[in-house]
Amino acid sequence: MSRYDDFTEVERAILRIVQSNLPDSLTPYADIAREVGTDEETVLALLRSLKEEGPIRRFGASIKHQRAGWNHNAMVAWKVDPAIVEEAGTKAAEHPHISHVYYRPSSAPDWPYELYTMIHGRHATAHMDVIEQLRRETPLEEFAVLESLRELKKTSMTYF
């Protein structure tokens, strides 16, 4: 059993609030503290410890990329030699137009692609520039492009 199995009710209440939208104010942490019946330092200490220990990877604003002009997306599936997955995946993850990189081994005979990158662009063919760059900078060659036609659901996971 880990520390995370034993959150107090106050900690759970804090986490329920911060996993959605922070209060729109100059003192969001004090506002959260007031709402859950604790002090601001308790809120900050919890968030700081979870960030340091790893369950909170990052804490920041979520941008609605379509409204910011990044409305063309493509999932690019790459055929990758398992020996270079780390190298190729790390290089792809460094690219500013790639938001997600996953390695998913496949046993399907007609689907040899195992490394997946989500590429975002401002125009319909922007992903091709990123693909060509990755092909120049890594041993990746064979790929399949799965373009996003429509977003059917996009929500952040809620845990508490």
From Swiss-Prot:
The keyword Lyase applies. It is an enzyme of class 4 (lyase). It holds the Pfam family NirdL-like_HTH. SUPFAM superfamilies: Winged helix' DNA-binding domain. GO terms for molecular function: lyase activity. Keywords: Heme biosynthesis, Lyase. It comes from the Bacteria. It catalyses: siroheme + 2 H(+) = 12,18-didecarboxysiroheme + 2 CO2. Forms a heterodimer composed of AhbA and AhbB. Also forms heterotetramers. Involved in siroheme-dependent heme b biosynthesis. Catalyzes the decarboxylation of siroheme into didecarboxysiroheme. Binds heme b, but reducing agents do not affect the activity of the enzyme. Belongs to the Ahb/Nir family. This is Siroheme decarboxylase beta subunit. It comes from Nitratidesulfovibrio vulgaris (strain ATCC 29579 / DSM 644 / CCUG 34227 / NCIMB 8303 / VKM B-1760 / Hildenborough). The lineage of its organism: Bacteria, Pseudomonadati, Thermodesulfobacteriota, Desulfovibrionia, Desulfovibrionales.
